[in-house]
Every structure is written in structure tokens, then in C-alpha cells.
């Protein structure tokens, strides 16, 4: 290091109260850098391309504690989850349950086109009857969950029925065999042999409905269009109940639902919200959102974590909403998938028990823990617990009723034997989203040119902010370190944003910076040296930022599941990211006093929330530069992208009003440069 550079470094270190590089003081009381420092540096070190090794080393320095991004997102989510208070009276709870049920249906499930799906006249087609086994037969059918989406199903019917009998809807989870899974067939067979009508339905994405179009992560494509992605899952179950209850021998007072895993989720979801269900047995299917935030195995995928569900209810609420109807909670002691009994069961019992007591039905709440085999199963032990539950509540006076499994393995059919013809163009989650996206954004709600954007800019900007849940985050800056090597000046920061997030920022300058640019990349700052070197060589001060979900701020495990869980609380990951970028831009403008900062992004994801930040932050962000940007949200649907690939891009309702071109118009007259 030259003597001059040693003097400059000493001066730089002495200015610790103003640790940013070559900037005017942030406040009058702070000491300014040496008056002639920039000119001296220029003469001593004419601008060259910065040393790549030095840039890479500065960018690679860790600024956050281990697991800090995880801890912060867990705390953020938990602070937004609804809590269940014990009811003070029977009447109070009944009113609460009615309101929760109404709000969940209206504000979460039946949004957008889902309302029309709910009210549509739909078909049921009865097909072949095949032999079952001693005492029962199987009727094949298909029914529409919503227009164009047919669900294959099997109805197990006892022979020689008379009068009315209990009916049971059997749903299932992530088993590629779907309705042909042997343990599901055995359950339906045993129900029929006990005199009940059992409906075995296929689940979206499984069995005959397997395929990329029904990947559960595709349901968020519907969310993007402003229609609830959870609606097809819910409607598939309500229509199944319609089919069951239309049977002339159905007893409407004895209506059960049971299922494993995703079927356990389906069981509590439909049973808590559809009061036609009079008994439910969810098996290893769910836990409270509070539990999920701390136990990664319980972080359910898209249907378990629909957008905005936790603005109304937690799964503890749904459990309590079964009261006073009989409920059997079944969990497995050594579950090798999810929802292990040791952590999942007790919070649900704690929530539901006071409600069952308040309603005078403490004996209607049951639980069962499977010890052998204890893994993720609805095996014989769990099935026998279910049969016992049915006997207790549906056949209390039947002498000789037994909960013992009736051996029926020889009657299990192959998937081919149980196959049901489906239309070649049967709808999928993806095809439904394609149909919706075709006419979006809605023309009467959007704008197409700079003139109309300018006229309605403030209104559209506010609407965009509301859709992404944008927030004005206060910034508290903590300076970590500063240094110089071969003319490259670096300063490391932690920026505390809104009291919730800590975002790492690396400040770099080579020579005299003529402007400040905030840089963000999908790959993270540490893998973006060439792009940052280019900006430095162009005479810019670079603030290399890793916002929520990227680079050093990336959650080490299950990251996309935490992102959709944040969306379930009513927040939007896209808005979190855009708000962080906007806050850092304001900080950079005020800190360095060179006017509005520029924003440079690399990658389709960072370019999208960077564009939104630029549209919303008119004063602090000037020029917006992007490389490899997303050109339309419709490409996510056309290419059948799943939410796990880029969860922030599936922001509920955004495409209904804004595509990328409309957001770009809100940036005008500021410059957008695409590389």
C-alpha cells in the first residue's frame, strides 16, 4: 500500500461516525470526510477495473448470524397468526363459529371465479357396477367438482339395503396410487361390510388425476389470477358429499369423513366448514400453524397453506369448529412424514377441549395414537380406532358391533380394475389458470399507455401497494466494518427494517463514486461479482443487497414453505421484498446525498420485485436497470411453473389487475434499461 493510501485509510477509519464511503455527513453533528479526499484518490488511483478477488472477498463476508433469516421469518409469521380464546359461553362460541365459517368461505375459498364454480350446475355420471366381495358391490362414477373438472370415484354399497344407513366420504393424501391404495380400499370394504355406504374419491394430483397440470404447486397459478387455488380442492369434497347425500339410503344425520395425510387435512378442512358432516377422523393430516412454524416436517404444501387462511383461522380453530360433532384425532407416534403425535396432537386438544366442554359434549372429542407400526399410516390399528368411533356414535345400540378389521385382502382390486373413463380434455389446475389468465389483466380495471397511467397513477400505485401488501419500513443501520484494498473501498452493514428483518448490505466504491446503485440478484450478492465489478468500473457506489429469501437472507431449509406460510398470514413475499428494497433505496439516498439511487437487478425474480419497488418508491429510486427480467406473469402459467420455484411471484390477485407492462408504466417518466 502506498503512503498516500495509508493516509487515506487512516482518514477513512477516523470517520467511523460516518462510516459510508465518500458521502456528505448523515447529520450535521457527524464529522465529514476530508474535504479533498475524492480528488486525491482520483489522482493517486485512476479508475481501472476493480480487482475481482477483492470484490469477491468483500461480497462473501458473512454479515448475519447462523439461522438468523429463519429465526426472523418464524417470529414474523408467529406474530401474525390468530389465537383461539376459550369461549365464555355456548352461545358465544356458536356465534364465533358461524362467523369464522362464513369468513373462511367468503374471504379465503370462494374468491374470484370460485364463486361461479360454487354456484354452477354440475354433472354426475354413473357408470359400471363391478362385483366387490361378500355382501357389497362397487359402483363406478365420475362427478364434476367444477365445470370441466371431473373426479373419478367409487361407491361401495352394501347389498340388499333398506331404510337409511350411515355414509362415509373417504379422502386421501399424497399417494400416487390414489383411490386404488390398498389401505383405502380395505377401509371402504370394511365400511360396506358394516352396513355403511362408502365413497372413495380421487384426489387432485394422485391416481388417475396425476400429471404436471395437477401438481399442487400449480394451484397458486389460480391465486395469481385472483381466484382461490384452494377452491378446486374444497369443491371436490363438497360435490362428493352432494353425491353421497343424494343416495336414497343416505342417513343425513350420520355422515362421516376420514382420510390419511393430505386426506387428514381434507377431512378437517371440509368437516369444520361443511356442517353436513356429523363425524370426522383426520389421520396424520395437520397441525396448528404455530406448530408448523417450529417443526419443519409439518410445513404443509399449497393446499395446506392457502393464501390468507390464517387471517381468519388457524387449524386449532378448525379443530374446535367441529364441536359438538364427534371428532377422532389420530396421530402416529413415530411418523416418518409429518405431524408426529408428540408435537402435533396436544395443541389441538388444548384448543378443542374447552369448546367441547362449553357445548356440553366433552365425550364427543376423541384421540388415538398409533404406536405400532407408528409410522405414517392408516393401517389396521388406526382403522380399528375409526371403526370403534363409528360404532360408538353411529351404531350405539347395535348388539354385536365389532371394531375388529374384517379380513378382506383378497378383495383388493388393481388400479386397472378400478379405473374410470375421463374426458380427454379434463380440466387441471393449470388449464383452469390458463383460461383465467387469457383475459387478464381486467381491461376495465387497468391501463394500457403512459397517458392513462399518468392520469390514474396515484390510484393504480396505491392499488398495487395494497395487492402486494407493501409497507413503509423504517431503517435502523448498524455499521459492521470498513476497509480499503488496492483502491477498492468497502463497508459492511446490517440494516434493520421495520423491526422485523435484518438485511445484509455490502457497500463498495472504486475511486470517486458519481452515483449510488442498489444491486440485487437472484443468485445473491456473493455470486454476482462480475455484475458488481461492471458497476464499480462505471464509477458507481454499489450497495449489494440480499433481501428476504435471497443470498445470505435465504432460509437454509424449507424456504418456499415459509414463503407460502407468510402468504397465509395475509402478507405477500413479493411485497416484503419490494418494501425492503424501497426502504434501502431511501436509506441510500439519505445516507449518501447524491439524489435518487439507481436500482440494478439480475434475474426474473429480483427484477420483478425491483420493478414493483421502483413503481412504488417514486422519490428515492431513479433509473431502473434489469437483466433477464420476467416479461409477463402469464409465462409462469404458460410454462406451468410451480410455487416452490419462485413463491413470491404467485402473489394473490396481482395478474387480475397488473401484468409487467402495466407496472412498467407506473415507473415513467423514470428510465427503465433492460440488458
What are these regions (language model features)?
Residues 162-246, 252, 286-296, 514-591, ...:
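Cap/lid segment of the alpha/beta-hydrolase catalytic domain
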Residues 98, 189, 268-269, 320, ...:
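Alpha-helical segments flanking ligand/cofactor-binding loops in enzyme cores
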Residues 202, 258, 283-284, 330, ...:
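Alpha/beta-hydrolase-fold catalytic nucleophile elbow
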Residues 28-150, 180, 315, 323, ...:
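Alpha/beta-hydrolase-fold serine-hydrolase catalytic core, especially in secreted/extracellular enzymes
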Residues 194, 240-311, 584-657, 663:
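Primarily recognizes the serine-hydrolase "nucleophile elbow" in alpha/beta-hydrolase
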Amino acid at each position: 500500500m502506498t503512503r498516500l493510501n495509508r493516509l487515506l485509510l487512516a482518514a477513512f477509519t477516523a470517520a467511523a461516525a460516518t462510516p459510508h464511503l465518500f458521502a456528505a455527513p448523515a447529520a450535521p453533528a457527524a464529522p465529514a470526510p476530508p474535504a479533498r479526499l475524492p480528488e486525491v484518490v482520483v489522482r493517486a488511483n485512476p479508475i481501472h477495473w476493480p480487482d475481482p478477488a477483492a470484490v469477491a472477498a468483500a461480497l462473501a463476508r458473512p454479515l448475519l448470524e447462523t439461522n438468523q433469516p429463519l429465526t426472523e421469518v418464524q417470529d414474523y409469521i408467529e406474530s401474525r397468526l390468530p389465537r383461539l380464546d376459550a369461549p365464555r359461553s355456548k352461545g358465544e362460541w356458536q356465534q364465533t363459529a358461524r362467523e369464522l365459517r362464513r369468513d373462511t368461505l367468503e374471504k379465503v375459498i370462494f374468491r374470484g371465479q370460485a364463486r361461479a364454480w360454487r354456484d354452477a350446475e354440475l354433472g354426475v355420471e354413473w357408470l359400471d357396477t363391478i362385483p366387490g366381495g361378500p355382501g357389497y358391490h362397487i359402483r363406478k362414477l365420475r362427478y364434476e367438482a367444477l365445470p370441466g373438472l371431473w373426479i373419478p370415484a367409487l361407491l361401495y354399497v352394501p347389498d340388499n339395503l333398506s331404510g337409511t344407513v350411515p355414509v362415509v366420504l373417504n379422502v386421501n393424501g399424497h399417494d400416487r396410487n390414489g383411490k386404488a391404495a390398498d389401505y383405502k380400499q380395505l377401509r371402504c370394504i370394511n365400511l360396506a361390510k358394516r352396513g355403511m355406504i362408502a365413497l372413495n374419491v380421487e384426489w387432485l394430483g394422485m391416481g388417475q388425476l396425476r400429471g404436471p397440470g395437477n401438481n399442487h404447486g400449480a394451484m397458486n397459478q389460480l391465486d395469481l389470477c385472483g381466484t382461490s387455488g384452494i377452491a378446486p380442492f374444497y369443491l371436490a369434497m363438497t360435490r362428493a358429499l352432494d353425491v353421497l347425500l343424494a343416495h336414497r339410503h343416505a342417513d343425513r344425520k350420520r355422515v362421516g369423513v376420514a382420510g390419511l395425510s393430505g386426506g387428514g387435512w381434507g377431512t378437517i378442512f371440509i368437516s369444520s366448514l361443511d356442517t353436513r358432516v356429523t363425524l370426522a377422523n383426520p389421520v396424520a393430516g395437520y397441525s396448528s400453524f404455530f406448530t408448523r412454524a417450529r417443526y419443519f416436517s409439518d410445513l404443509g404444501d399449497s393446499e395446506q397453506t392457502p393464501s390468507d387462511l390464517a387471517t381468519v383461522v388457524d387449524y386449532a380453530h378448525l379443530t374446535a369448529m367441529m364441536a359438538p360433532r364427534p371428532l377422532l384425532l389420530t396421530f402416529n407416534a413415530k411418523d416418518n412424514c409429518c405431524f408426529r403425535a408428540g408435537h402435533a396432537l396436544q395443541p389441538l386438544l388444548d384448543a378443542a377441549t374447552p369448546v367441547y366442554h362449553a357445548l356440553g359434549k366433552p365425550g364427543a372429542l376423541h384421540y388415538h395414537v398409533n404406536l405400532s407400526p407408528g409410522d405414517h399410516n392408516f393401517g389396521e390399528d388406526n382403522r380399528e380406532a375409526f371403526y370403534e368411533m363409528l360404532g360408538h356414535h353411529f351404531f350405539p345400540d347395535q348388539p354385536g358391533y365389532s371394531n375388529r378389521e374384517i379380513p378382506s385382502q383378497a378383495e383388493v382390486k388393481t388400479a386397472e380394475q378400478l379405473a374410470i373413463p375421463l374426458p380427454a380434455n379434463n380440466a387441471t389446475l393449470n388449464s383452469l389458470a390458463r383460461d383465467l389468465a387469457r383475459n387478464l389483466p381486467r381491461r376495465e380495471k387497468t391501463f394500457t399507455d403512459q397517458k392513462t397511467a399518468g392520469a390514474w397513477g396515484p390510484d393504480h400505485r396505491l392499488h398495487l401497494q395494497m395487492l402486494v401488501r407493501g409497507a413503509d419500513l423504517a431503517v435502523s443501520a448498524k455499521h459492521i466494518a470498513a476497509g480499503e484494498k488496492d483502491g477498492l473501498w468497502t463497508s459492511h452493514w446490517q440494516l434493520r427494517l421495520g423491526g422485523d428483518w435484518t438485511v445484509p448490505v455490502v457497500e463498495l466504491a472504486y475511486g470517486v463514486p458519481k452515483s449510488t446503485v442498489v444491486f440485487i440478484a437472484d443468485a445473491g450478492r456473493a455470486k454476482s461479482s462480475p455484475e458488481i465489478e461492471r458497476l464499480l468500473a462505471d464509477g458507481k457506489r454499489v450497495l449489494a443487497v440480499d433481501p428476504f429469501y435471497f443470498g445470505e437472507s435465504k432460509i437454509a431449509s424449507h424456504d418456499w414453505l415459509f414463503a407460502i406460510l407468510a402468504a397465509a398470514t395475509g402478507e405477500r413475499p413479493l411485497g416484503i421484498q419490494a418494501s425492503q428494497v424501497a426502504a434501502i433505496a431511501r436509506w441510500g439516498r439519505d445516507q449518501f446525498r447524491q439524489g435518487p439511487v439507481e436500482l440494478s437487478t439480475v434475474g426474473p425474480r429480483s427484477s420483478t420485485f425491483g420493478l414493483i419497488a421502483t413503481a412504488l418508491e417514486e422519490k428515492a429510486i431513479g433509473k431502473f436497470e434489469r437483466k433477464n427480467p420476467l416479461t409477463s406473469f402469464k409465462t409462469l402459467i404458460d410454462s406451468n411453473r410451480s410455487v416452490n420455484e419462485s413463491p413470491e411471484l404467485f402473489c394473490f390477485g396481482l395478474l387480475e389487475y397488473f401484468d409487467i407492462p402495466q407496472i412498467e408504466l407506473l415507473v415513467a417518466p423514470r428510465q427503465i434499461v433492460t440488458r
